[in-house]
UniProtKB/Swiss-Prot annotation:
Superkingdom classification of source: Bacteria
Name of the protein: tRNA(Ile)-lysidine synthase
Similarity comment: Belongs to the tRNA(Ile)-lysidine synthase family.
Comment on protein domains: The N-terminal region contains the highly conserved SGGXDS motif, predicted to be a P-loop motif involved in ATP binding.
Record carries keyword Ligase: yes
Length: 317
């Protein structure tokens, strides 16, 4: 079944055709269905990689499971490193994020030490839908609902997520058909964590209320957001070419033709502030736009900077 999936999945084909097969990579291997699926996928495509498993110590059985993973990888001829999260990370105020930071720091370190060209992560379509819904409910802007990208980076190391379009159920079906045993991580269903509550309660409740699957509409929204973001970057760049820096003062001209386009004006201002080294909130951008639109001069504080608005000009110093 795995070979049939490879043959029929055009997005996977495009992804692997662009991958530098002369290099070696790192696979973040939890031992769950998603990362095991990715392990066999990479192996079937002839990708050279080292698996890295991080034992978080959240379950009594986790040490034994790590050893079983090591044996499985050795039987498959796959190099594997096992690491254990120090106890202080498990007792922090936010153990989930603390463990995540530990993992990524470790992955980065291993990549540097072994000259690995990137990190493979097994996030799938359901993970993507959760990310989009979470960002939507947190009030993210339209252009920030795009979710995770198939190719990003952590510091200077590329991150690859080739499974973002594949639903969790397909992954499970393939592994069941191949009789591949997986680790069942109980933290994935522990309702102390937001992601677990989303999987166990929020998504099932929404699908029951709407009477249909909501994963695909959220993935479509993420794609629309990605396309909007790309379009806005193209539209904004000619105006951002007007940015100037003199000593410690940044400035940009905001012509009337731009002010007539509300969304684009706020996008240009947001990017201007970002390139000048500060992040502007949605409320702050609206205030800046209101002054530009009404031609009202103003001075405001943004973090430790002073923002000056004059006729058709925004400055930050």
């Amino acid at each position: 079944m795995l070979s049939r999936l490879l043959r029929d999945d055009k997005l996977l084909e495009v992804f692997f055709s662009s991958l530098d097969m002369k290099k070696s990579y790192l696979l973040a291997l939890s031992g769950g269905s998603d990362s095991l699926f990715l392990l066999y996928l990479l192996k079937s495509r002839g990708v050279a990689f080292t698996a890295v498993h991080v034992d978080h110590g959240w379950r009594e059985s986790s040490y034994r499971e790590a050893e079983e993973l090591k044996i499985r990888c050795e039987e498959e001829g796959i190099p594997i490193l096992i690491d254990h999260v120090p106890p202080e990370y498990r007792t922090s105020r936010d153990p989930e994020n603390a463990a995540r930071r530990y993992r990524y720091t470790l992955f980065h370190k291993v990549c540097k030490e072994q000259n690995l060209a990137g990190i493979f992560l097994a996030h799938h379509a359901n993970d993507q839908a959760e990310t989009v819904l979470k960002r939507l409910l947190e009030g993210a802007s339209l252009s920030n609902l795009k979710g995770m990208s198939p190719k990003t980076s952590y510091e200077d190391i590329p991150l690859f997520r080739p499974l973002l379009h594949i639903p969790k159920q397909i992954i499970i079906n393939v592994l069941d058909a191949e009789n591949v045993p997986c680790v069942q991580d109980i933290t994935n269903t522990d309702e102390r964590y937001l992601r677990a509550r989303m999987r166990k309660k929020i998504f099932p409740w929404l699908e029951e209320i709407f009477g249909k699957n909501i994963t695909q509409p959220l993935l479509t929204l993420a794609q629309d957001s990605e396309e909007l973001s790309c379009y806005m970057k193209q539209q904004a760049e000619p105006f951002l070419e007007n940015m100037r820096k003199e000593n410690t003062t940044w400035s940009i001209e905001i012509p009337q033709v731009l002010i007539e386009q509300v969304f684009l004006t706020k996008w240009v201002c947001k990017e201007f502030f970002f390139r000048a080294g500060v992040v502007a909130s949605r409320h702050f951008l609206q205030t800046v736009y209101d002054h530009l639109q009404r031609k009202l001069p103003a001075q405001m504080r943004l973090r430790d900077k002073r923002v000056i608005i004059k006729a058709g000009v925004v400055m930050i110093e």
